[in-house]
Amino acid sequence: MKTESKIDGRVKRSKKIRSDVHQKLILSAIKIIEDDNGKSGVNISAAQLSKISGVSTVTIYSHFPNLQVDLSLSILNYLLDLALHHYNVNLMNNMREKDKLNLIYKGLSYANTKFPFAGSQVYGLLMVGNIFNDNFKNHEFVNIRNNIIQNIFKQENLKISKAEFMRNLSIYVNGTFHAAVSNIDKDKEGEKIFLISSWSKVYENCSKVKLFDIS
């Protein structure tokens, strides 16, 4: 019995350590994106992440085997969780789909204002691939985007069509964008904040492509 208790304790500690390292890596990735002003998108190398986090590249790949896809999804999940806490709601397990979707959309919109660069990069991946890459149909980023979307649907067991999900997401996030613009005159720091964020680039690029083509 004591042996089993010791084993359980070790397993719990091991899981806690792994969870702490995982969050450290996500926060480090967000910092890289923010410090870079979103210029490179969610395009982070294991070496970059290792340098800023102090975690070995071997450990990084154990957390994110498919680095860009897994890291993008983890950042998205982190920002959504952050937003859910911001809205003071519980986990979405028992929610109706309509309410669940509403929180996902609001969460992504909130992420874009809380972390202008990291949030908009994840949104950019969802909508158009790498928003700072002129080749929006770049195969790698289309795959990343589609993997993220598929994971959202799998995790949350959504019945809505992917096209409708993307269309609604666009309406929510663009609404947040317009709210940010409308508040510029009311806040002397507003214009400065808007100009240094990547909102304008996201909005500009989203108008150039078929947002809802997720084939």
Model-derived regions, located:
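Hydrophobic alpha-helical connector segments
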Residues: 88-114
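Amphipathic alpha-helical segments used for helix-helix packing
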Residues: 112-132, 178-182
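Helix-turn-helix
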Residues: 24, 32, 39-70, 74
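Short, hydrophobic secondary-structure boundary micro-motifs
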Residues: 41-43, 118-124, 214
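Amphipathic alpha-helical packing segments from all-alpha helical-bundle domains
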Residues: 84-88, 130-157, 163-170, 193, ...
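Hydrophobic/aromatic-rich alpha-helical bundle segments in the mid-to-C-terminal region
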Residues: 123, 154-202, 206-215
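Basic, helix-initiating cap at the start of DNA-binding domains
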Residues: 1-40, 48
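Short, basic, alpha-helical segments at the C-terminal edge of helix-turn-helix-like DNA-binding modules
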Residues: 46, 76-84
